[in-house]
Amino acid sequence: MTARREIEAITARIAERSKPARQAYLERVEAAISAGPHRTVLSCGNLAHGFAACAPSDKAALAADRVPNLGIVTAYNDMLSAHQPFETFPALIREAAREAGGVAQVAGGVPAMCDGVTQGMPGMELSLFSRDVIAMAAAVGLSHNMFDAAVFLGVCDKIVPGLLIAALTFGHLPAVFIPAGPMTSGLPNDEKARIRQLYAEGKIGRAELLEAESRSYHGPGTCTFYGTANSNQMLMEIMGLHTPGASFVNPNTPLREALTKEAAKRALAITALGNEFTPVGRMFDERSVVNGVVGLHATGGSTNHTIHLIAMAAAAGISLTWQDISDLSDIVPLLARVYPNGLADVNHFHAAGGMGFLIRELIDAGYLHEDVRTVWGEGLRPYAIEPRLAPDGTVARPPALEKSGDDKVLTTAARPFQPTGGLKVLTGNLGRAIVKTSAVKPEKRIVEAPALVFHSQEELNAAFKAGLLDRDFVAVVRFQGPKANGMPELHRLTTVLGVLQDRGRKVALVTDGRMSGASGKVPAAIHVTPEALDGGTIARIEDGDVIRLDAEAGTLEVLVDDATLAARPAAAPDLSANGFGMGRELFAGFRALAARADMGAAVFG
């Protein structure tokens, strides 16, 4: 089925805008492909170093250059619950490779930080830039020229975008992404949020809060709310970089093991040594990008991807803009309600029909490009399935459920939860910003109130504890952009502002920083660009200025005349403390080079 005319028009616009960069990118990919399997250009000394530690049979196969070699790029560490399962994946992948007549080696490891651990801490100021570090670290591993394809083991917030940037940089190689899956359900997410608010109000102590948090985050796998990590998995599947049905199967299950081994075998099957050569640089095009944005809107996904998708697309020579994202939001309906956009978690979403149901609905309604190439082959329709374990231990894929298993969690395109997507671009005299509307009640989407200005989230939290915020206001938290301090997430403010909203106050947030993908019920204009340190109007706001945030109309304005604003000096706080501690001193160059949020906030030229 062909995509709707409006979807086709936006895709064509992206393709036309991207022509020079995309052509240059594809020329580089084709030049690398024409060189053939890269082990053939290695000297005997190079090659001997490359397989010195391999098993004798693998060494013999690689020496003869007769089998494909699969590079494993892993983001394993055992502090991240989502990445702990990856400890055993290389052994599974090696076993699968041998069964398929190939070899697999760990090409390299990349860092993986947990935003849940660093939230509200100095380390959070490294979070966004870790994406580009991950891309560079993966590139180092793949630069040995030993591999015919690569698999990428990653799940969480910056890890998957960084890995995809690296994969596209090595676009002459096939690339398959392998997830670990979500942890089993624990304390319901709405109950966790309620307990956090009680703690913020001083009604319970740290012991009670820690007990609740530990019941929420209790085992291996991805956090179960629909934040950036699970948005990543949705994107990889809907853009055809996972094998069908791989995203949301729990870790340490026979089905997850079968999916992992199958992904390794599939990566080997699509190398230049076989008959289905699928280099990721050819495969991933503007249709793939649009499918990703459509999936993001249809599920109410993470605001972080209004930054990451732009950076990922750019790695393939594709120019995606906030306007494209906004225009698609006006077209694509919301089909999923997963916390913070609802009460269910991703396990409930998967049980209700999951990615297969969602993809089928979006294809049949004309919102997705079906005519794409994926790691599985031609077309996206094979992803409209439900993964199951077959009696022989392999993966079976019957068609997706005809009806949603729970229409409060997952619905049809004919009966959407709302007619438009979950993300919107705001414009006005404060610049441009992003707001996530899918978790905000319609009556809370317009706020007009005096500004209270803060230069850190700690300042706002201190004002709350001092009892100074029990009123209507718009919190302006500035100097949180990429150039100022690395654009940290300000997710801790959600609890404080949520308490005030529950007391009946009209509250909103305006910031040049980010919010977590889990951010919810309080309207928040985030990623304000230009940022305060880059000459943005947000640097000229003063306490008492009336700000109007209208998430319905898509506007963000300070109600002060232009002449008055222009005459004001920009605030210039001392930001020297941002440059030291927890490794921040090593990232001064990143802060200096970072692009604007609406350009992907990348440090690469």
Where are these regions (language model features)?
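Catalytic or ion-coupling anion/metal-binding cores of large enzyme and transporter domains
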Residues: 1-68, 74-78, 82, 91-108, ...
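Acidic/charged coordination and interface sites in well-structured regions
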Residues: 88
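N-terminal small/polar loop signature for handling phosphorylated ligands or for N-terminal nucleophile
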Residues: 107-145
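N-terminal glycine-rich "phosphate-gripper" loop used for MgATP/nucleotide binding
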Residues: 131, 153-156, 353
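Contiguous domain-boundary segments centered on the initiation and propagation of an alpha-helix
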Residues: 131-138, 143-150, 461-472, 476
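Mid-sequence acidic-hydrophobic segments that form the walls
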Residues: 137-145, 153, 166, 219, ...
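A short, small-residue-rich loop immediately preceding and capping a beta-strand
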Residues: 141-163, 176-178
